[in-house]
Amino acid sequence: VTPGTLTEDNLLDSKRNNVIVSLAKLNETLGLSWLDLSTGDFYTQEISLRDKDEAVILSSSLARLSPVEILVSDSYLQNSALFNILNEYREKLSVLPQARFNSENARKRLQDIFKVETLDAFGNFSRAETTAAGILLDYVENTQKGQMPRIEKPVKVYENKVMEIDGATRKNLELLESLTGDKGATLLSVMDRTVTAVGGRLLAGRVASPLVDLPEINQRLDVIEFFMNHPRLREDIRELLKSCPDMERAVS
């Protein structure tokens, strides 16, 4: 068992995701894949590095995901700028041989795990994303001694859908954690009126990854407006939710 493969409720924060992330770089593309094994939620993201500072991209991505464990190839640490960023997470690093980061092997691994002939039904994944995702699930299966837990199909997060905030700015904004490391003096603590663990994790994820996609922003605002205009229904639903167990983690 590693920090990123814990699933025991008594060892996890009920309102925070326990994220393990994998990084894979191919040419000018950074592939990210992350998983919360306690819920089965599984994501990938492709980030273009063309005309961008790779160290800044890496820093902002890791700060956004706040992983408890990071899978990275040994060759990735040879870049001094990237090494300095990853060194901030040194206690969370699991370094793997570069030879394991093969996109074709990763693709086949994903097809075997999800029992599909092609990944096209799940989305249009880049080679970098596929590599990161395949490495991640292979690592999880190895740590679980071949007993792969329930994992949702991979969801692609598009680069221009969420705001990228560098690590220093995110820290100063005190979104999820204050400058002193206190979780009780943050934007999340002010906003969090959730009554379930599932809702708490969802809110924390949304605060950490602000949307920049206008249609999705308006969709969320429409839902907020509806419940603001129907206070009795809102309170009735809150009362019902209070008795709901953490189904995400129970099912996983």
Regions found by a protein language model. Give the residues of each.
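Amphipathic, charged alpha-helical scaffolds that flank and support histidine-based chemistry
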Residues: M228-I237
